[in-house]
């Protein structure tokens, strides 16, 4: 029996690891590893290559949205170091960070899972016994077959994480084998619902396509705004691009809660109260309108601002005026014909209504209140009404930004463009996140700082756009049988209720088993105590992991997945990296670990679906690349193995250039006719908040004026760490020399008021949970706001866990977890 949680030693001490397995160069790079962990034997190396260093192609596949291309250096059968791979076409994409440099330490970590295990103690106690792969797979298959027979295929749910963004081994990666397994089995999917608001707002306003502006255009911007994100830590590969643009002449401005590295490198720092960025935008827009700095021509030609809205909140269309709608081309996404029924505008030139495409001068103002018997208002008039109450003075009272700075920002966006706006996920982590992003995107549209050279959104994302992902997921069996199709999606916020009550919205939902891969949900989802209840009450939990994560401790069956460099794969997520990255198998899998790809196939075969998994790595990647875009680019499995990287040249450097947005009418959306929430848990929806895409309300707990702040006076945010990505890299011991333990950063005035000194032990708590950690004093920290660098496991905290203090509720329409919208009280221990 193995007791994980009570173990005081993981096989390596820091001293023995550094002495026997690694040497740190002055730059912090791991230059050598040896097999010193118990049970780890050196691989048999080709004697003819003794002492010769081979270089294999690798990719960093964690979810940091960077996707760095790596060289994996192997000597005598062991990985000894990593370096940045060469990208000759665009060398500014060549990067490696401390996490990429420390991959060898992950490979040879004493925290690696070595063999399959079965739980023998209480869930979460970390008590397991060693079993064989045959036993593990047979037990999973027997349980799942029984559940399927008694309760149906939806009694099993997959939680597919984003911790491995690769097609063969990944979870959420486009067209992954895990998604194929789920589709074949008809299992449900538990949605992580992480960092959704940013992408939701962007796709809602600009249409379903990427908006990221390539670094090639950054040097042409007059201003670059880092707004609510921390690229110096969270997106290290991009930070030098910001600084390069600054050197080229762009003024760099950071809008943030706290003083950080980005601020130190910026020309101007605008501190703002937590989650009040939307109020700041309203103040900026108020000044823009007052000064007449809106880009009226852009609004007329490229947005819905001149569209006329009827009393039922739908647009006035030509069919309303007696012109029948027509059938248009088939929508590639839905497979159904589109409907051509043009929206109507008021044409200033002819003083009459016209289809938007035929009007000479679409009017923004001066429009009759009634047209052809319909009472109407243009979208622009409702935008002006929404902004009218938010003077710079009122906005300043809410967001804490001085009036003069609000006016300066208005001049920047309204008069001094082009402006590039950089946002990642920081603003995502509040209950009002969707309204914040809507407002910032509206600011860009109203001032014409998008769809033009060197203007737009710096941080985009989404699919690489080259794959046959649907063909992979729905691949028939070798006998021609079609897969069952995926089961229902379960929103994270609903999981505990389903597990506990065995129903959803009053109807039976007998969920019996959960399968987790590429994720650590205990540490990375909100309201940890509720997460743990879900894992304790689920009948059968299967976890597939590389290390003993917090989630792995709760598994009934624990499957050891190998490291990314121990198997062949392709990194497929694009985000800010427009290249496919081929991952060589540099060494054999250590211990008894197996590639995720093999594990998915083993499970599928044991479940009786072997004919659906009659493919090799080459077969699956080849099918994944069987797409029009890949063919146009000349990318095949063979070519990718040879070149190691492949550029999707169909991805544009400025996708929205010319003001062409990804909607049928080519215009940016500012009004939603039909409000459709992203999730349905029977919640009431106040649609008045959702029609005009320029609305704001305070956060739930981070709001300084929230009633809960009387009981819990401090809001808490959790910034990323330089040495970890979420909880990955927790097991790299020497990286803890840089970030040793969880801490809480306090503003000096707050610390004095609380009687807290540097190094004191403090407890942060609310009604949901608590965490005990060390205090540190930081003058750059905003008053009444505590910053706790996250990514630590529960057992690394003195007591409790940072993840326990967050709540698990969503905005009424957006399925978005709120990691920073949390208030606590502080107790000095």
PLM feature spans:
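Extended redox/cofactor-interaction regions of prokaryotic respiratory oxidoreductases
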Residues: 2-3, 172-243, 248-254, 279, ...
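N-terminal export/assembly segments and adjacent metallocofactor-ligating motifs
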Residues: 2-297, 301-363, 375, 393-394, ...
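N-terminal leader/propeptide and maturation segments of large enzyme subunits in energy/redox metabolism
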Residues: 119-135, 293-403, 586-671, 738-740, ...
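Glycine-rich phosphate/diphosphate-binding loops that line cofactor/substrate pockets in enzymes
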Residues: 137-156, 214-222, 385-386, 407-420, ...
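Conserved short loop/turn motifs at secondary-structure junctions
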Residues: 159-168, 394-401, 424-431, 463-464, ...
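Flexible glycine/proline-rich, aromatic-decorated loop/lid segments
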Residues: 261, 549-582
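Short beta-alpha connecting loops at secondary-structure transitions
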Residues: 266-272, 579-589
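Long, contiguous, secondary-structure-rich segments that constitute the structural scaffold
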Residues: 596-640, 727, 732-745, 749-829
């Amino acid at each position: 029996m193995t007791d994980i949680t009570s173990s005081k030693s993981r096989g390596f001490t820091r001293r023995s690891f550094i002495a026997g397995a690694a040497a740190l160069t002055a730059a912090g790079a791991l230059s050598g590893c040896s097999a010193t962990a118990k049970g780890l034997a050196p691989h048999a190396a080709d004697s003819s290559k003794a002492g010769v260093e081979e270089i294999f192609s690798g990719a960093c596949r964690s979810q940091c949205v960077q996707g760095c291309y790596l060289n994996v250096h192997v000597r005598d059968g062991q990985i000894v170091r990593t370096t940045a791979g060469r990208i000759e076409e665009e060398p500014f994409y060549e990067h490696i960070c401390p996490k990429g440099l420390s991959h060898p330490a992950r490979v040879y970590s004493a925290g690696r899972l070595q063999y399959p295990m079965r739980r023998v103690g209480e869930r979460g106690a970390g008590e397991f016994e060693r079993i064989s792969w045959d036993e593990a797979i047979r037990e999973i298959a027997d349980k799942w077959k029984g559940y399927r027979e008694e309760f149906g295929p939806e009694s099993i749910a997959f939680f597919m994480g984003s911790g491995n963004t690769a097609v063969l081994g990944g979870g959420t990666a486009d067209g992954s084998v895990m998604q194929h397994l789920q589709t074949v089995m008809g299992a449900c999917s538990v949605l992580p619902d992480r960092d959704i608001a940013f992408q939701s707002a962007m796709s809602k306003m600009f249409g379903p396509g990427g908006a990221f502006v390539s670094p090639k255009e950054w040097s042409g911007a007059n201003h670059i705004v880092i707004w609510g994100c921390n690229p110096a830590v969270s997106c290290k590969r991009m930070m030098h691009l910001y600084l390069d643009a600054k050197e080229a002449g762009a003024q760099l401005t950071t809008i943030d809660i706290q003083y950080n590295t980005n601020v130190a490198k910026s020309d101007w720092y605008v501190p703002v109260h937590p989650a009040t960025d939307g109020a700041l935008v309203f103040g900026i827009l108020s000044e823009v309108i007052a000064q007449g700095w809106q880009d009226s021509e852009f609004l007329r030609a490229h947005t819905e601002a001149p569209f006329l809205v009827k009393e039922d909140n739908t647009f006035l269309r030509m069919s309303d005026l007696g012109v029948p709608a027509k059938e248009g081309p088939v929508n590639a996404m839905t497979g159904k014909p589109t409907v051509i029924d043009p929206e109507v505008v008021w044409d200033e030139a002819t003083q009459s209504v016209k289809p938007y495409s035929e009007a000479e001068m679409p009017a923004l103002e001066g429009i009759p209140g009634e047209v052809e018997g319909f009472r109407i208002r243009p979208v622009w008039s409702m935008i002006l009404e929404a902004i009218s109450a938010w003077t710079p003075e009122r906005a300043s009272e809410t967001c804490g930004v001085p009036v003069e700075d609000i006016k300066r920002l208005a001049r920047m966006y309204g008069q001094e463009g082009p402006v590039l706006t950089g946002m990642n996920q920081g603003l995502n982590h509040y209950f009002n996140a969707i309204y914040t992003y809507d407002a910032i995107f509206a600011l860009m549209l109203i001032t014409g700082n998008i769809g033009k050279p060197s203007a737009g959104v710096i941080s985009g994302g989404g699919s690489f756009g080259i794959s046959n992902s649907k063909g992979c997921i729905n691949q028939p069996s070798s006998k021609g049988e079609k897969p069952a199709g995926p089961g229902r999606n379960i929103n994270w916020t609903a999981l505990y209720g389903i597990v506990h009550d065995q129903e959803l919205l009053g109807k039976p939902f007998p969920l019996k088993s959960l399968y987790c891969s590429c994720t650590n949900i205990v540490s990375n989802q909100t309201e940890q105590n509720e997460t743990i209840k879900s894992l304790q009450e689920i009948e059968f939990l299967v976890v597939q992991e590389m290390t003993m994560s917090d989630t792995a401790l709760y598994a009934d069956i624990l499957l050891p997945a190998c490291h990314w460099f121990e198997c062949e794969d392709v990194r497929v997520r694009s985000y800010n990296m427009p290249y496919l990255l081929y991952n060589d198998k540099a060494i054999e899998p250590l211990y008894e670990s197996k590639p995720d790809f093999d594990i998915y196939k083993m499970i599928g075969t044991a479940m009786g679906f072997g004919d659906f998994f009659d493919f090799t790595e080459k077969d699956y990647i080849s099918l994944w690349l069987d797409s029009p875009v890949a063919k146009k680019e000349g990318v095949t499995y063979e070519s990718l193995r040879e070149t190691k990287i492949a550029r999707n040249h169909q991805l544009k450097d400025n996708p929205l250039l010319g003001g062409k947005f990804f909607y049928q009418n080519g215009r940016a959306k500012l009004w939603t006719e039909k409000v459709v929430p992203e999730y349905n848990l029977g919640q009431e929806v106040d649609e008045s908040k959702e029609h005009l895409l320029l609305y704001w309300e305070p956060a739930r707990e981070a709001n300084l004026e929230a009633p809960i702040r009387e009981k819990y006076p401090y809001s808490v945010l959790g910034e990323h760490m330089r040495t970890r990505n979420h909880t990955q890299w927790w097991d790299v011991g020497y990286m803890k020399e840089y970030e040793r333990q969880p801490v809480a950063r306090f503003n000096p005035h707050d610390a004095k008021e609380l009687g807290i000194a540097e190094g004191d032990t403090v407890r942060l708590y609310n009604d949901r949970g608590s965490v005990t950690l060390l205090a540190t004093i930081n003058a750059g920290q905003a008053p009444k706001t505590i910053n706790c660098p996250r990514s630590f496991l529960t057992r690394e905290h003195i007591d409790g866990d940072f993840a326990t203090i967050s709540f698990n509720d969503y905005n009424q329409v957006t399925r978005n977890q709120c990691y920073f919208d949390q208030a606590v009280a502080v107790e000095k221990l």
